[in-house]
C-alpha cells in the first residue's frame, strides 16, 4: 500500500516538475505596454492589447486575445469592423508589425493626423478596401 502511495507521489512530482521547467524560459507577458513598442512587451512572444490609443496590457496570443478585439469598440481589422461597431469609417493600423489590428477613426485623414503626432506618416498602413 505504501509503495502505491509513493509511486503516485513520484508521478505527481515528475508531472509538476515537467510543467515548471517548460515555463522557465518562457517570456513574461504581464504588465503595461504601448502598441508602438517593438517588440511589444519586450518579447515577440507577447502581444500588446490596447485599452486606449497609446496604452495597453501584455498578454500571450490566444483565443481570448482575439475575442477582446470583437468586444472593444475601437479595435479593428478592417474598415468594415469600424462601420459595424459604429466607431468610425477607417481602420488605421498601428505601425507595429506585431499588432494585427488597428484603431477606428472617422476618416483616413484623422488617423494620419493622430499617428503623425506619434510616429512618421509613412508607417501608417491602410487596409482600406474602398
Swiss-Prot record:
PA1b binds to basic 7S globulin (BG) and stimulates its phosphorylation activity. Involved in the signal transduction system to regulate the growth and differentiation as a hormone peptide. Toxic to various insects through binding to a high affinity binding site in the insect gut. One of its GO terms (molecular function) is nutrient reservoir activity. Disulfide bonds join 29-46, 33-48, 41-58. It comes from the Eukaryota. The C-terminal glycine may be removed from PA1b. Keywords: Disulfide bond, Knottin, Seed storage protein, Signal, Storage protein, Toxin. This is Albumin-1 E. The keyword RNA-binding does not apply. The presence of a 'disulfide through disulfide knot' structurally defines this protein as a knottin. Residues 1-26 form the signal peptide. It comes from Pisum sativum. Residues 64-69, 123-130 form a propeptide. The keyword Disulfide bond applies. Pfam families: Albumin_I, Albumin_I_a.
